[in-house]
């Protein structure tokens, strides 16, 4: 298996099914966890020096922090309903407690925090929805925590790729601290597949090909993108979902397309406008 794939496992005693830390990934900023909680189960964590974005992938929950409480949040029972999720932003030096009101799949997105912003609910109505690309590189985007919304480090977005389509395409990268042209951002991809016995294909490669891996990704896999371009393909018969977490020294998403393939987007958009 590729060193960039972290596979999910059966829930442990606290419900965790996958975990990425900066230490385990060999980088500095991004952490990511998923919990599969049964109805009535409770998860309690301190954020310490990290901020967190709790994304309710599916199911309903009560969530409270040190100063805030939200009851009976959650709307979708499956990510492929394509309804924007409920999420909760939690600053560093805080605590969160999640009580599952139904079986619950919860993503915990983590990055360094400074305690600048208070805890808040991010309801579906505040999630920006857009269609990006055209033709067989068109995909649906849910901007959960974009750079236009307050946070210290985190950027969080989910993407739906129709069967037979590509996303994160044209291949792009954000691994150089070269503003305003490109920002350095580490990134995780948490994949789900419908039907769940299918697979996605993801490539991670650099200009000099010091990294050049093409991976078969299963349902529940996390792909690490420390640097390089990272396109995704959904084979016929299977639609893909992924939740992206990004963070780096500056909270901005400035990317560079692979110049060999940048023309594809222009070609697809031109065909769409005809």
Curated annotation (Swiss-Prot):
Annotated GO MF terms: 5-deoxy-D-glucuronate isomerase activity; glucuronate isomerase activity
Disulfide bonds: none
EC number: 5.3.1.30
Keywords in alphabetical order: Isomerase
UniProt KW Isomerase keyword: yes
InterPro entries reported in the protein's UniProt record: Deoxy-glucuronate_isom_IolB, IolB_Bacilli, KduI/IolB_isomerase, RmlC-like_jellyroll, RmlC_Cupin_sf
GO terms, biological process: inositol catabolic process
UniProt catalytic activity: 5-deoxy-D-glucuronate = 5-dehydro-2-deoxy-D-gluconate
Gene3D superfamilies in UniProt: Jelly Rolls
Pathway(s) the chain acts in: Polyol metabolism; myo-inositol degradation into acetyl-CoA; acetyl-CoA from myo-inositol: step 4/7
Domain of life according to the entry: Bacteria
Pfam families: KduI
Known function: Involved in the isomerization of 5-deoxy-glucuronate (5DG) to 5-dehydro-2-deoxy-D-gluconate (DKG or 2-deoxy-5-keto-D-gluconate).
Protein family: Belongs to the isomerase IolB family.
The protein's name in its UniProt record: 5-deoxy-glucuronate isomerase
Protein source organism: Geobacillus thermodenitrificans (strain NG80-2)
Gene: iolB
């Amino acid at each position: 298996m590729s060193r960039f794939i972290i596979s999910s496992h059966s829930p442990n005693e606290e419900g965790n099914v996958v975990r990425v830390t900066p230490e385990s990934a060999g980088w500095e900023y991004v952490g990511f966890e998923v919990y599969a909680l049964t109805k009535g189960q409770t998860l309690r964590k301190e954020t310490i020096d990290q901020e967190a974005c709790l994304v309710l992938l599916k199911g309903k929950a009560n969530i409270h922090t040190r100063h805030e409480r939200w009851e009976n949040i959650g709307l979708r029972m499956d990510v492929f309903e394509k309804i924007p999720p409920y999420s909760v932003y939690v600053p560093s030096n805080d605590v969160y407690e999640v009580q599952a009101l139904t079986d619950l799949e919860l993503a915990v997105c983590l990055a360094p925090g400074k305690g600048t912003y208070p805890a808040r609910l991010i309801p579906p109505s505040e999630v920006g929805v857009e269609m990006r690309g055209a033709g067989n590189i068109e995909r649906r985007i849910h901007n959960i925590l974009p750079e236009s919304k307050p946070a210290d480090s985190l950027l969080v977005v989910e993407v739906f790729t129709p069967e037979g389509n590509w996303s994160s395409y044209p291949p792009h990268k954000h691994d150089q601290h070269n503003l305003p042209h490109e920002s350095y951002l580490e990134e995780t991809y948490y994949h789900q597949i419908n039907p769940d016995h299918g697979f996605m294909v993801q490539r991670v490669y650099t200009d000099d090909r010091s990294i050049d891996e093409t991976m078969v990704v299963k349902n529940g896999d996390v792909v690490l993108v420390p640097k390089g371009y990272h396109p995704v393909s959904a084979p016929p018969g299977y639609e893909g979902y992924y939740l992206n977490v990004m963070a780096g020294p500056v909270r901005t998403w400035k990317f560079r397309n692979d110049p060999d393939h940048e023309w594809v987007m222009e070609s697809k958009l031109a065909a769409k406008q005809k």
